[in-house]
UniProtKB/Swiss-Prot annotation:
Any Pfam family hit: YbaB_DNA_bd
The name this protein goes by in its record: Nucleoid-associated protein SAOUHSC_00444
Domain of life: Bacteria
Database matches in Gene3D superfamilies: Nucleoid-associated protein YbaB-like domain
Organism: Staphylococcus aureus (strain NCTC 8325 / PS 47)
Compartments it resides in: Cytoplasm, Nucleoid
Transmembrane regions listed in the UniProt entry: none
Record keywords, A-Z: Cytoplasm, DNA-binding
Biological function: Binds to DNA and alters its conformation. May be involved in regulation of gene expression, nucleoid organization and DNA protection.
Region (Disordered): 1-33
Compositionally biased tracts (Low complexity): 7-16
Length: 105
């Protein structure tokens, strides 16, 4: 069979890439990414898997007469942390798929 060796080599490369990507996913699980808003008045920490693990709100951010502002700060900090987590994931996993012409990756 012609080309069989190439297919085997490609399968080995794919298995190796899958293993490396699984290892990176585990590392991302342990990463902590912080998003802030309001000049640091609100900080949200997420994992590389985008699980919120901590929310810090400084006392000066709490105004009982303006709860909406605090909500906006929490949302902004959360979105920043999630975006940073996406960027980190893309950076870490993207290096393993560079050069491959696989649809959807």
């Amino acid at each position: 069979m012609r080309g069989g060796g190439n297919m085997q080599q490609m399968m080995k490369q794919m298995q190796k890439m899958q293993k490396k990507m699984a290892q990176e996913q585990e590392k991302l699980k342990e990463e902590r990414i912080v998003g802030t808003a309001g000049g640091g008045m609100v900080a949200v920490t997420v994992t590389g898997h985008k699980e919120v693990v901590d929310v810090e709100i400084k006392e000066e951010a709490v105004d009982p007469d303006d709860i909406e502002m605090l909500q906006d700060l929490v949302l902004a900090a959360t979105n920043e942390a999630m975006n940073k987590a996406d960027e980190l994931t893309q950076e870490r996993l993207g290096k393993h798929t560079q050069g491959l012409n696989i649809p959807g990756m």
